């Protein structure tokens, strides 16, 4: 993967996305230093675009920073970076989900629960083709079910209400096996 990403970066040296993708590959391999170098290169390339940099590119820089901190077990910094990414793009599903994960590891289950619930609530009014609809995923449902087990006064009731909601808003091909009872 890194050889392919290196070839892409050489063919389009001003494209920050290639460096960001290489950083993610390094994170997956546990190479924090390699990830940091790639993410810094992506950030510099994005900054060099100036006004031409899109909100998506700016948001990716913040999300990369958050993922780097999350992987490095620096949860407060990860939450700050993800919050900044969410401020740039309300429909940044990855930033919201990863911020919720960072909140769990930071010991703040209530914030994690609120982030996941708000992400699911945003789906109700989202256009069918909106990125916000990507929030309905088995991993989000499983994570929220786990958080309900730990925080809800009546976990069974909370999970049942969420499952009923998911059945109303989820696409037809949604994997319902993730829904606990």
Predicted regions and their residues:
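Active-site-proximal segments of catalytic enzyme domains
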Residues: 14, 18, 22, 29, ...
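TPR-adjacent "capping" and linker segments in tetratricopeptide-repeat scaffold/adaptor proteins
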Residues: 9, 51-57
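Alpha-solenoid helical-repeat scaffolds
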Residues: 1-25
